[in-house]
């Protein structure tokens, strides 16, 4: 019974950090064990990257005329998405002259913090805050249709079971 008690008594961390370790974590405390795993993971990824770069250099040396490999499909999609966002943002920036956000766009009255920001992106006073008053270019009908379409997806007949 004394031997069983000795097996279960806590052991100090193998790194002598002052905390207790367990046999499941190689006699390390949880923090030291986590650090050890992190170091092993970093070294394995570094070795993997090194072998890939050496293989790429060897392949490039053997065929100096070969074209560069195409980028992965995911990066193409990301580049296309970024270019679409930039294209969509450019016309908005080019539409109006640089404006002072503290003045109404229509009457140029100072509004300060009491100004109303419209969905078209401009600031208006209390008189011109409504879309009809400042000839808003924002398409509220399209926004409403998009919200309804998003909230109520189309139910396809082939997914429903017939009674």
Swiss-Prot record:
Q: Where does Zn(2+) 1 bind?
A: 13, 17, 29, 32
Pfam families found in the cross-reference section: zf-A20, zf-AN1
> Which residue numbers delimit the AN1-type Zn fingers?
98-144
Q: What domain of life does the UniProt record list for this protein's source?
A: Eukaryota
UniProt keywords, alphabetically: Metal-binding, Zinc, Zinc-finger
Which residue numbers delimit the A20-type Zn fingers?
7-41
Where, in this chain's numbering, is Zn(2+) 3 bound?
Answer: 118, 120, 134, 136
**Disulfide bridge map:** none
- Residues that, per the record, bind Zn(2+) 2: 104, 107, 125, 128
Q: Where is this region: Disordered?
A: 57-101
One of the protein's GO biological processes: response to heat
GO: which molecular function terms?
A: DNA binding; zinc ion binding
Compositionally skewed regions (Basic and acidic residues) per UniProt: 74-89
* Zinc is among the record's keywords: yes
Q: What does this protein do?
A: May be involved in environmental stress response.
Tell me what this protein is called. Answer: Zinc finger A20 and AN1 domain-containing stress-associated protein 3
**What species is this protein from?**
Arabidopsis thaliana
């Amino acid at each position: 019974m004394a031997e069983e008690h000795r097996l279960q008594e806590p052991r100090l961390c193998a790194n002598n950090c002052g905390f207790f370790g367990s046999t499941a974590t190689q006699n390390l405390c949880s923090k030291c064990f986590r650090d050890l795993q992190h170091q092993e993971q970093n070294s394995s990824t570094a070795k993997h990257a090194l072998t890939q770069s050496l293989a790429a250099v060897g392949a490039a040396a053997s065929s100096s005329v070969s074209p560069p490999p195409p980028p992965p499909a995911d990066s193409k999609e990301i580049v296309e998405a970024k270019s679409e966002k930039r294209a969509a943002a450019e016309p908005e920036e080019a539409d109006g002259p640089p404006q002072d956000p503290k003045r109404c766009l229509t009457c140029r009255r100072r509004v300060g913090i009491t100004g109303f920001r419209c969905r078209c992106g401009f600031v208006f006073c209390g008189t011109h805050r409504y879309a009809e008053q400042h000839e808003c270019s924002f398409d509220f009908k399209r926004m409403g249709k998009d919200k309804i379409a998003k909230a109520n997806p189309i139910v396809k007949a082939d997914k429903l079971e017939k009674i």
